[in-house]
Amino acid sequence: MAFNISTQLNKEQRAAVTCGKGVNIVYSGAGTGKTTIISQRFAYLFNQKRINPSNILALTYTRKAASEMKQRILELLPEKYHKDVNIYTFHSFCSRFLREEGQKNFVIDDDLSNFLKDFLKESELKSQKVLQIIDGFKNAYFDFDTNSLKDDERLVELCEFHLDPQERNFQLFKETAIAAFVEYEKGKQQNNKIDFADLLIKTCTLLSKDHKLLRKWSKKFQYILGDEFQDTNQIQYELIKMLASHHQNLFLVGDNNQMIYRWRGAVSDIIDSLKSDFKVRPENEFYITQNYRCDQNILTVANSILGTIYAKENQPDSTKGFLFSAIKSNRLPVYFQASSVEGQHSWIINKIKNLHKNHGIQYKDMAILFRTNRNMDSMTEALEADGSIPLKQNKGFFKQLETFKKVLVALITRSNYDIKLALKSLRVWPNVLNKSLTVNEQVNLDKILQNLEQAIFLDEHTRGELTEAAKVFTRLIKFVEEQQFEALLAFTFEALNTDQFVCNFIFRTLQKLQTENKNFTITDFINELRFQQDELKQSKDNVINLITVHSAKGLEFEAVFIYGINQDNFPLKSKNQIIDLQRELDELRLFYVALTRAKKYLFLLSVYQMSGEIIYPSKFIRFINKEDRLEIATINHKVHQDDEFFDSSKTEDYQKKYLTENTDFVNGDSVSHRTYGKGVVVEVREDAVCVAFKNSKYGQRWIVKNHRDLVKAVY
C-alpha cells in the first residue's frame, strides 16, 4: 500500500519519522497517531535506509497493540518481507528468546493466586492483592548482577501503595506480604511454573551474565522501536538497554501525561534515566500535539487538567504537551450531578438510549469508565434490571478457559498441586486424598493414579474411590503421549461441560498451531492460549463497554461516561488517607486518560449523596472552568427519568414533578405510576425505590420516592 510521507503525515510526525540514527524520543499525546508514527518509522528504515525488517525490533505492551502495529507495517512492506517482521510484546519477545536459547521446559501461569491462598488463610490480606505487590516489586527492582531482589524497603513501599490505611497501620500486614512473596516463589519453583515477570527476569539474567549471547542479540537488531515508553518499568528498561547496547539506535514513543502504571512498577523518571544513559540531545526530542481523535471542546477540558499537572510539577514551557484538533463542533462536554447513585444509573441509561436511538451511535462505540472495578457492579445491576441495553458477558468464558488450562497444565507438570486442581475441576477428586497427602508428603499422585496397586498405604475403600479418578487421568495421559490432541480436547470438553464458544476458541488455537508448527508441544499450546486471551477480551459484539480507566487506555469511543467523579473515589482515597503530591499526579493523569478516550460525546458524572450522606464532587471537576468548558446538565439534585430531559428544546420546569416530602415505602407495597402502570416495590433505598411493574415492557425501574407520578395503591 503506497504511503506518501510528505503528504500523509503532518509536519511534527514527519520530523519524527525521518529522524537520524541514535536515541530519539517522541512525546506523542493522546490520539496523535502513535501507531502511525511507529509503523511509518519502520517503513522509512526499510525504504529509505535499506534496513532489512529482520534487523528491526518493535516492542509494545499488549497483544492487541502488537497485532494492530503488525497489520499496519505489513501493509507498507512487500509481501516477501512479511515473515521477517519482528513485532512483539515484551513478554512474547522474552518467550521467543528463552525458547531459542534452550529454555523450553516452562509453563507460563497467569493465575498463581492458589499458591498464596493456604498461606494467607489466617490473614486478612487477599491473594490477588499480594500478587499485585509481588508483580510490581519483581518488575521494578530485580538486580541481575546478584540474581536477587534489591531491597525489602521497596517491597514495603509497594505494600504501602496497595494496602488500605487500616492494613498499613499494622506492621503484621507488611511482614505477611513479604513472607507471602517467599512462599509464592517457592511454590512456583516446586511446581515448575513461571509468571510473566519471570519471563523478563530470566531473559535479562541470561543477557547480563552471557556476554556472547548479549553480543549476538544486540548486533541482530540494528534499530529498536518502542511504544508507550512512559509505562516502562525498570526491568523492561534494562532489557531495552541491553538489546540496544551495540548499535544504540532507539526510537521510543510515549506520553508522560499518560503514565498510569506506577503501581505495577513503571518508573516516573524513566525518561530522565534514558536521557542520561544515552546522552540524548534536545534535537533528538520531538513533540506531537495534533490530535486526530477528539473534538476540540473535549481537548480544551483535557488541556485544563494538563495545565494543573504542569503547575503542580513546576514544569517549564508546560504548554508543549497541550493538544489541538481540527475537529470542531458546538457540542460541549456535559457535567451531571445526580441526587444519588441510582439517579446516576438512571441518567446514564437514558442518555445511552438517547444516543443510540436519536444519534445512531452503536452500543459498542459507547463506554462507561470506572475508577475501580467495585464501582462497576451496581451500574451493571442497573443495566441488567433495565434489560434494553446489551451487556458483554465474558466472566463465564474466561473462567471456563482457566479451568481447561488447569487440566492441561497437570498433564505436563504431574505435580500433586496441579493434579489436585485438575481432578477437582473434572469432579473426580476423592476427598480422602486430602488427608493422605497431608499425612504423607512423599505421596506421588502421578504414580498412584497410573498404577493403583502401588498405593499400599491406602486401604481398599480409599483405593476404590480412586478408581474413577485414575481412569480419567490415565486416559488423558494416553492422549498426550500419543499426541491425540483433538481427542484430548473432545474428552476434556465433555468432562468439563465446556460451552461451545469456548470449545471453538480452543480448537481454533489448536488448528493455528498445527498449521504453523507441526512439532508443537502441549506446552506451546498452553502458552499460546494464554497469550491470546487479551484479544478475546476485546469483544466485537455490539454491547456497551463497562471498563476501568486503566483498561480503557489505548481505546477510543464515540461517547464516554466517566462514572463517580466524587471526593474519595476519583482521586481514589480511603478514609483518613492523605494523598501526597505524587499520588495526586497519578490520579490526575488517569483522569486525563479517561477524558481523552472520547471522540464526540463526553459526560462527567458525580452524585450529591450516598447512603444518606452528602458527598462532594471531586476537586478534579473544580480544575475545569465549568462556565466556559462544560454544559451543566442539572443542579436540582433530582433523579431524571424522562426522555424529554435530554432534549434541550424542552423548557418544562422539572422541579414541579417532585413533591416536597418523601413518601414512605416498604418492600411489597403496591404502587401505581402514571406512565408505567401498576407494580410492586421490591427494594427501598434512601431516596429511591425499585418497582417491578406488571407490564413486562417496563420491567424493574428505579424511581425517586417523591416523584408525583408514583403513588401507593390498593388493588
UniProtKB/Swiss-Prot annotation:
ATP binds at G31, T32, G33, K34, T35, T36, R293. InterPro entries: DExx_box_DNA_helicase_dom_sf, DNA_helicase_UvrD-like_C, DNA_helicase_UvrD/REP, P-loop_NTPase, UvrD-like_ATP-bd. This is Probable DNA helicase II homolog. Belongs to the helicase family. UvrD subfamily. It is an enzyme of class 5 (isomerase). Has both ATPase and helicase activities. Unwinds DNA duplexes with 3' to 5' polarity with respect to the bound strand and initiates unwinding most effectively when a single-stranded region is present. Involved in the post-incision events of nucleotide excision repair and methyl-directed mismatch repair. The keyword Ligase does not apply. Residues 7-295 form the UvrD-like helicase ATP-binding domain. GO terms for biological process: DNA replication; recombinational repair. It catalyses: Couples ATP hydrolysis with the unwinding of duplex DNA by translocating in the 3'-5' direction; ATP + H2O = ADP + phosphate + H(+). It comes from Mycoplasma pneumoniae (strain ATCC 29342 / M129 / Subtype 1) (Mycoplasmoides pneumoniae). Keywords: ATP-binding, DNA damage, DNA repair, DNA replication, DNA-binding, Helicase, Hydrolase, Isomerase, Nucleotide-binding.
